Design a protein with these regions (language model features):
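Flexible "arm" and connector segments at domain edges
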Residues: 1-68, 74-193, 197-262
Length: 262
């Protein structure tokens, strides 16, 4: 990349991250708790704040989202300052790596030709001796890891031609789960359920929705509906513990009808 391009595509200037980094430096200089934190000790807070950001997005509570994004920004700034103190990196080097990556991954914007696709670009960045599935984050949840693996192998042509093939695979795996259950074989049940979930993730990938997003919304929908079921039961003096499935199923249908009409 030439000096002209570096100048053309650089986005300089102080911003929110710089202010957050300065705030964390002040905290570490003046607060014993902040001063003793390490990259490892901060991991639980980073994960918690990430989940809270996701919750606020999915709940549509944008006032809460503003606060949660601030908490997440603080955690990111904290990691940068801890690394600065250890002499391994600083905010400028973090940003420079980000900027260089985005320029590589948006060739259509920065004079590098047409965009060949995300997985193709990321494959070019991997060392030639590494396999297509190398480098996946160890902390990925199983659904996302399945999704990413299937994305990557698809980039080298190992993929169904359409979602129909994935749909048939789901049906095949479902039948195998049933066979394992009926054979009363716990080890086989575990294996076949895993295969079924893996196939369902692939179907989701080809059909459109990200499986983690789809499952998260399904969880939220179930939680909302069952909470309403419990509310109806309380209003009618019904104990959910002793009501029985028929009564609970009737309340469940009422809740779904309310949502349909409402």
């Amino acid at each position: 990349m030439t000096d002209d391009k570096d100048e053309q595509h650089h986005f300089p200037g102080p911003g929110t991250l710089d202010r957050a980094v300065r705030l964390v430096r002040f905290l570490r200089e003046n607060c014993p708790w902040d001063a003793e934190q390490t990259a490892e000790s901060l991991i639980p807070y980073l994960l918690e704040e990430t989940h809270e950001v996701v919750d606020a997005i999915q709940d549509g509570t944008f006032h809460d989202l503003e606060g949660e994004l601030g908490d997440l920004l603080l955690n990111l700034a904290f990691q940068i300052v801890v690394a600065e103190d250890a002499g391994t990196m600083d905010a400028e080097s973090v940003y420079r790596r980000l900027e260089e990556k985005m320029i590589r991954r948006h060739p259509q914007l920065f004079g590098g030709g047409e965009h060949p696709g995300w997985e193709v670009l990321k494959a070019r960045e991997r060392p030639p001796h590494e396999g297509v599935l190398s480098g996946l984050a160890k902390g990925l949840d199983p659904l996302t890891k399945s999704y990413r693996m299937q994305e990557r192998v698809a980039s080298v042509g190992f993929d169904w031609e359409s979602y129909e093939g994935a749909w048939d695979k789901v049906a095949e795996e479902l039948a195998e789960v049933r066979g394992a259950v009926e054979a009363n074989d716990p080890a086989a049940v575990e294996e076949e359920v895993g295969d079924l979930l893996f196939a369902a993730v692939n179907l989701a990938r080809l059909a459109g929705p990200h499986p983690t997003t789809a499952l998260s919304r399904a969880n939220s929908k179930f939680q909302r509906r069952f909470s309403r079921l419990e509310q109806l039961a309380r209003e009618r003096g019904i104990s959910t513990k002793s009501a029985g499935l028929e009564v609970l199923d009737g309340l469940w249908d009422e809740v779904k009808q309310e949502e349909t009409e409402g």
